[in-house]
């Protein structure tokens, strides 16, 4: 389980002088906007795109977006929670029944042979399996956190530094 905390900057507070002529760290006044619990999931590792298809990581439906906008106009994008959790605000369509929500699974897949030694980009595939759901009556949005600690560590070991970019490949359909 991970959490998402959103705060809003209110104002700076003046830095105060400590003994010895050094300054204390800057303080900030912030307002808590929201806090949410996010379920966490393991990230799948496969050696190639072909193995992703063969290892039964089904993709039976597209998602709508990874940049969801709420009723107040606030857009949520994927973010890192520390260096170990990648949080995705995933939106998809489904039948308007609670039991159908349980049918939908989202798997994040890392393909080991996709990066070369000079790569600065880490690529994941998001696979949406709709189960037995056959309708697209309503939008569903969920924040899902994926454990990427081992992948980040392996990337740093292979490339000498952490990635500068994370790309998520997913089938998208807005209709």
Where in the sequence are the language-model features?
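First exposed extracellular module after export/assembly in secreted or surface-exposed proteins
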Residues: 1-175
């Amino acid at each position: 389980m991970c959490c998402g905390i959103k705060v809003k900057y209110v104002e700076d507070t003046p830095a105060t002088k400590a003994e010895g002529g050094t300054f204390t760290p800057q303080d900030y006044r912030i307002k808590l906007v929201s806090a949410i619990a996010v379920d966490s999931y393991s990230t799948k590792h496969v050696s190639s795109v072909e193995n992703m298809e063969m290892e039964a990581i089904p993709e039976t439906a597209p998602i709508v977006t990874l940049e969801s906008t709420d009723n107040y106009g606030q857009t949520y994008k994927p973010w890192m929670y520390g260096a170990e959790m990648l949080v995705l605000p995933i939106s998809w369509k489904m039948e308007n029944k609670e039991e159908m929500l349980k049918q939908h699974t989202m798997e994040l897949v890392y393909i080991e042979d996709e990066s070369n030694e000079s790569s600065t980009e880490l690529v994941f595939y998001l696979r949406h399996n709709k189960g037995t759901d056959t309708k697209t009556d309503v939008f569903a949005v969920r924040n899902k956190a994926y454990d990427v600690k081992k992948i980040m560590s392996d990337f740093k070991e292979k490339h000498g530094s952490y990635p500068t970019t994370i790309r998520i490949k997913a089938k998208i359909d807005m209709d």
